[in-house]
Amino acid sequence: MSKVIGIDLGTTNSCVAIMEGKDVRVLENAEGARTTPSMIAFTDSGERLVGQAAKRQAVTNPSNTLYAVKRLIGRRYDDPTVAKDKDLVPYAIVRGDNGDAWVEARGEKYAPSQISAFVLSKMKETAEAYLGEPVTQAVITVPAYFNDSQRQATKDAGRIAGLEVLRIINEPTAAALAYGMDKKNTGTIAVYDLGGGTFDVSILEIGDGVFEVKSTNGDTFLGGEDFDARVIDYLASEFQREQGIDLRKDKLALQRLKEAAEKAKIELSSSKETEINLPFITADASGPKHLVLKLSRAKLESLVDDLIQRTLEPCRKALKDAGVSAGEISDVILVGGMTRMPKVIEAVKQFFGKEPARNVNPDEVVAIGAAVQGAVLKGDVKDVLLLDVTPLSLGIETLGGVFTRLIDRNTTIPTKKSQVFSTAEDNQPAVTIKVYQGEREMAADNKSLGQFDLTGLPPAPRGVPQIEVTFDIDANGIVNVSAKDKATGKEQQIRIQASGGLSDADIQRMVQEAEANAEADKQRRALVEARNQAESLVHQVEKNLKEQGDKIAEADKGEAESAISATRTALEGDDLAALTQATERLSQVAMKIGEAMYKAQSEAPTGEAEAGPNGEKVVDADFEEVDPKKHS
């Protein structure tokens, strides 16, 4: 039975883990790292790079290197947060065919789900390389504060990558699951999760294998990327003040600034000061310009202090919704790379009044929890019950544009709730059910999840028809809505798909593209391997001709030179079949030459004097050891 893998699909980095017996193993990728940058690049030659390979070439290819795309997943192009992101990244964020925010590289448009699918495919390959068998099922994590559109888009990404997503699980819940598997860890815990692009906080009760989420809160547009942006802005402003040149308008310089900002931020977690040195960052009429600047930890903290403070308000709301005080929290778990920053640790310590737990790896704990949940779903781990919640209230628009809640935020899922509504006008033949998610009082101020019509209502005065609207949220946090006319029994049901979102046809097309690309990647790899083999063989045969030419017949020499020439010609092109054919011919010639050399060597008379360096004969002589005592 194949394993279920646990994937932490992060904004900045991703991680994959599996359950082996009673232990969870975080898997190393092909580069030997336990986390993989969530980056995709498209090169001039049409090659697609994922992870570290994409990150390495980002400075020279900024417009076609895509990162932090998770911040766009499930969002409309007109979303104000998307407009903010457009100014921060060197690649193009464009309007998708469905009105969602998509990205563009090398003239091609990609849905964020598609880009995420490339990262998930890399995680899938990592697991398959370790297990030595195909992997088809996964548990994927999302920020707890993701809405329905974002969850659905993440599930779509899994499908595009060829994975059956058994469960979408909230990141803080996954972290708590990993932490609580040690039976000693019980009580009311807070998970503070500050990652690359999102912030979440969850309050959970753990005990006797039951993990019950009491409340969750967060901000899906607050994370390490925003901290980096502050440093980039500071560096660019300082350079502009000194040199009069705005580096933010230069994509290449902006990418170099981003790398430097990220590196400086990490270094300042363990040092008080760091130097940023970027030679030849730009040039003007007077010549090349260099950026050299010292950045202290104190300066970094002053640049990002308001961002850290922004994380505390969701913490207050989460405590209030859970009905507990900070003093009742027994443990605080830190998740996400940003929680390594001393100022963040200090803020969390002050808020909760206790030292955060340090016995979890903030980069790996979420993937570990996802792997545990995968094992629970497979039945490999028993006596574990996970009770999660929906992060946002769900409801419909009623008369006057009011948002009428059917399911309140922090309701345990899965759940189902019904309410009866009526018509607003006499003889109304149909009703439109508009579904929203959020906490504002007016429907238009919340996130629209979609709408559908219930038609064929019999004529009746306003207020008489009874229309029962039912909301059903599954364990993934994904919403189904139905409306039923109680008089006629007529029913209309939809699985909510955002007004944008990807249709099944879109997903199927992207799956086929992913499969086609996988085949193209395989062909490209085969061509590279064939080139390496051909070049190595050419070198070997040429060496033998040069060093042992006198032992090889002229006819064989001519055949070898012809085969070498044919192989060199094939090496100039991209035809794998032609290169394979030329290499096979050269390989046969190489064997023939090898046999001739061996034969010539074995036929040489033993003891025949070999030529010395100056052409004279060198003779092997017998000698007798003389005992000096006998001749004294």
Curated annotation (Swiss-Prot):
Signal peptide location: none
Modified residues (Phosphothreonine): 198
Domain of life where this protein originates: Bacteria
Entry similarity comment: Belongs to the heat shock protein 70 family.
Function according to Swiss-Prot or TrEMBL: Acts as a chaperone.
HAMAP family: DnaK
Induction profile: By stress conditions e.g. heat shock.
Keyword field: ATP-binding, Chaperone, Nucleotide-binding, Phosphoprotein, Stress response
Disordered: region residues: 600-632
Gene that encodes it: dnaK
Molecular functions per Gene Ontology: ATP binding; ATP-dependent protein folding chaperone; unfolded protein binding
Record's keyword annotation contains Nucleotide-binding: yes
The keyword 4Fe-4S is assigned to this record: no
Gene3D superfamilies on file: 1.20.1270.10, 3.30.420.40, Actin, Chain A, domain 4 (3.90.640.10), Substrate Binding Domain Of DNAk, Chain A, domain 1 (2.60.34.10)
Protein known as: Chaperone protein DnaK
